[in-house]
Each structure stands twice: as C-alpha cells, then as structure tokens.
Regions:
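Glycine-rich phosphate/ribose-binding loops and adjacent secondary-structure elements
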Residues: 1-110
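Terminal amphipathic helices with adjacent charged low-complexity linkers/tails
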Residues: 8, 139-198
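Short alpha-helical interface elements
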Residues: 30, 61, 65, 76, ...
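Active-site or pore-adjacent capping/gating segments
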Residues: 74, 82-149, 153-154
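Conserved small-residue-rich
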Residues: 201
C-alpha cells in the first residue's frame, strides 16, 4: 500500500540528464496529477494517500493551481538551487560546477556564495504569495482548495483562434461520487498485532 504518490513533471529534473531527455521526454505535471486524482477518487482511495507534485514549481500561483488539481505536498529543487546561485550550466554530474553548487572540488566549492537565509527568504515569500491567493479565493486553509478544480477559471480574453480550440475538460473534470478528494485517513496495514509492534523498543 502506498502512503505517498509523487507526480514529477518533465520540466524539473537534474542538469545531468541527457539533452534529448530534457527536450523530448515527459509531460507536464498537471496532466499526470489530474489523472491520478481522478482515478483515486473514482476508486475511493484518495482519502488514504498523499499526493505530491514537483516539476518547475516557482511561484505561489503554481502551488495553488497544483493544489486545486489535487496535490497536498510540493517539491522544490531547481528554484532552490537557483536561489543558492545555480547558473544552470548542466555540469552537475561532472564535478565541474563553476559556482560550486554541485561539486566536491575544493577550489570550485570556494566559489559558492549561497546562504541559508536566501532559502528562508524565498520560501517565506512563496508562502506569503500562496496565502494572498487563498485570501483572494476566500478560503482560510490550504486543505479547502485541494482537489477543487471547480475553482479554476479559464481566462478567455485575448485568446487566439487556435487557443480557443483547446479544451481543458479532461484535466479539470471533478469526480463527485461522495469519496474523499484529499488525504483524510491513515492507511490500514493490518499489522497491529505483529511482534515487532508489540515489543517495547
């Protein structure tokens, strides 16, 4: 049984990936996340698992949209590395990172000027932006928007004729079968009476 399901978008990942994989492999996290959410709700399993998403999440808007599609946890890597000084040279696996972010070379590591305070500031402002979006929507807690695709409104102004042909119905479909749309209960593993659990530690 899974406690956590991670949906990773193609936009994220390591700079050590081959260029062909970065350009041509994978899909956006929205597609996988919405399909996972819909399938779990249809089968009455959504309440038992947490959904996590990552893949170039950078702003509060990204977080709020992913939450509306069903995510409860959010992964950040590229944005955090950039805050610490990463210049996206794609040398992570060669031990030659010119700014000392991804290297064990002592000379290159001396070029690293990132500080923990930069990350604290970044995530503080990110959380503040999320809070502002929640206030604008009119909800008090993040839990109130998880899986609520009905809150996503498509902006139709300034659309080109081709853009107006794109439909988001399958991504924004909401399953209303009375099942939970976010994590509500812990998994039941049926191991309450095994000796390892009963023995004092």
């Amino acid at each position: 049984k899974a406690d956590l399901i991670v949906s990773s978008g193609a936009e994220g990942g390591t700079g050590a990936s081959p260029a062909s994989s970065i350009r041509y492999a994978g899909i956006s996290p929205e597609l996988g996340l919405s399909e996972t959410q819909q399938t779990l709700v249809l089968n009455g399993l959504r309440g038992q698992v947490m959904l996590q998403v990552d893949g170039q999440l950078k702003t509060g808007r990204d977080i709020v949209l992913m939450a509306m599609l069903g995510a409860e946890e959010f992964g950040f890597a590229t944005s955090a590395l950039i805050v610490l000084g990463c210049v996206m040279m794609r040398k992570c696996h060669q031990n030659t990172c010119p700014v000392g972010v991804a290297t064990q070379n002592e000379e290159l590591r001396r070029r690293f000027h990132g500080r923990s305070e930069y990350l604290v500031n970044f995530f503080t402002f990110l959380a503040q932006e999320v809070r502002e979006y929640l206030a604008e929507i009119g909800v008090e807690r993040m839990d109130d928007i998880i899986g609520r695709t009905d809150l996503i409104i498509r902006k139709s102004e300034n659309e080109s004729p081709k853009q107006s042909l794109i439909t988001f119905d399958k991504i924004l479909a909401r399953v209303d079968n009375g099942a939970a749309i976010r994590h509500t209960i812990d998994q039941q593993y049926g191991i309450d009476h095994v000796k390892d659990v009963e023995m004092p530690h």
